[in-house]
Amino acid sequence: MQTYLFASGLVLFLLGLVTGLLVPVSKNPRMGVAGHLQGMTNGPLLIIAGLLWPYLELPDAWQLATFWLLIYGTYANWLGVQLAALWGAGAKLAPIAAGEHRSTPLKERVVTFLLFSLIPAMFAAPIILLIGILR
């Protein structure tokens, strides 16, 4: 899983770089910058998790769960913010970044789902990693 975390982190970092190029064509450029930064910060988070992986003392099932929580949380974070930028959505969860931008109810629900659903994943994964390191 260490190699997959490295690869996933590098892909997300690359997506963050590409996302930066899309800022000028986003409906909401401020949210576009936020999407760019999500890729640029969440990619290295996955790489750091990969560096910690050999030191984890966790059962296989917990390692697998942690891996998928990290992947889902980081990619949902990037995707949710990026879709909000492209669609002009995200007013409910990021009112300052969204500004006056609003999108269709379906697009707003998609962004809201992604951004709400990543919260448990992004809290659980580092807690499990910490437990695995301290064992």
Curated annotation (Swiss-Prot):
Lineage top rank: taxon: Bacteria
Subcellular location: Cell membrane
Transmembrane segments: 5-25, 33-55, 67-87, 113-133
EC identifiers of the protein: 5.4.4.1
Enzyme class: isomerase
Phenotypic effect of disruption: Mutants are not able to grow on nitrobenzene.
Entry GO terms, CC: plasma membrane
GO molecular function: (hydroxyamino)benzene mutase activity
Bilayer disposition of the protein: Multi-pass membrane protein
Alphabetically ordered keywords of this record: Cell membrane, Isomerase, Membrane, Transmembrane, Transmembrane helix
Main location, first listed in the record: membrane
Reactions it catalyzes: N-phenylhydroxylamine = 2-aminophenol
Function: Catalyzes the rearrangement of hydroxylaminobenzene to 2-aminophenol. Involved in the degradation of nitrobenzene.
Name of the protein this chain belongs to: Hydroxylaminobenzene mutase HabA
Species in which this protein is naturally found: Ectopseudomonas oleovorans (Pseudomonas oleovorans)
Origin organism lineage: Bacteria, Pseudomonadati, Pseudomonadota, Gammaproteobacteria, Pseudomonadales
